[in-house]
Curated annotation (Swiss-Prot):
This is Large ribosomal subunit protein uL4. Residues 44-78 are annotated as: Disordered. The gene is rplD. Gene3D superfamilies: 3.40.1370.10. One of its GO terms (biological process) is translation. The lineage of its organism: Bacteria, Bacillati, Bacillota, Bacilli, Bacillales. GO terms for molecular function: rRNA binding; structural constituent of ribosome.
Length: 207
């Protein structure tokens, strides 16, 4: 079982905590991680791209010149695709890019992401995380005490309004609950700061 240090909010080590082998101690699968990240990024795409076909472009209802006798090529509409300002053939239309990987693959991906943080020693487990009021300065002080000066993902067991509001104004810091932990967030942040309760909740779901 992986064993990591347990800290308090002041940044002092108060003990150690053993993490589940099944969640935090597996060999990271890079192929599965890649698939999960691509899936999440695809789901984030808006897919609102749109071009107009010849039937949707304004104008072009009448024949520009008669069929024969002008010496010019025959034309039926000034909005056909070969004309400047004409419709587009097989252009993009609004669509959803989202898709889902199998549940087992998604679970393996998040386990791989969490295990990679443990392996790289980029995880900080807190005894608890509570603020009396939403204060960005106080949250910044906690992170500084934990020697976190880069992008960090803060995870608590349940939604905490004070923590969420305190973290959102700090550049590079993202707050999520244990239920919202996902591969993309874990990978793109340099540090994973997670409370003891959140660890237990994640292990309960994924183990």
């Amino acid at each position: 079982m992986p064993k990591v240090a347990l800290y308090n909010q002041a940044g002092s080590q108060v003990g150690d905590i053993e993490l589940s082998d099944a969640v935090f101690g597996i060999e990271p699968n890079e192929n599965v991680l890649h698939d999960a990240v691509v899936m999440q990024q695809a789901s984030l795409r808006q897919g609102t791209h749109k071009t107009k076909t010849r039937s949707e472009v304004r104008g072009g209802g009448r024949k520009p010149w008669r069929q024969k006798g002008t010496g010019r090529a025959r034309q039926g509409s000034i909005r056909s695709p070969q004309w400047v300002g004409g419709g587009t053939v097989f252009g993009p239309t609004p669509r959803s890019y989202s898709y889902k990987l199998p549940k087992k693959v998604r679970r393996l991906a998040i386990k791989s992401a969490l295990s990679s943080k443990v392996k790289a020693e980029e995880i900080v487990v807190l005894e608890s995380l509570a603020l009396e009021a939403p204060k960005t300065k106080e949250m910044a002080s906690i992170l500084s005490g934990l020697s976190v000066d880069r992008k960090a993902l803060v995870v608590t067991a349940d939604y905490n309004d004070n923590v969420a509001l305190s973290a959102r104004n700090i550049p590079g810091v993202t707050f999520v609950t244990a239920e919202g932990v996902n591969v993309l967030d874990v990978i793109k942040h340099d540090k994973l700061i997670i409370t003891k309760d959140a660890v237990e909740k994640v292990e309960e779901v994924l183990a």
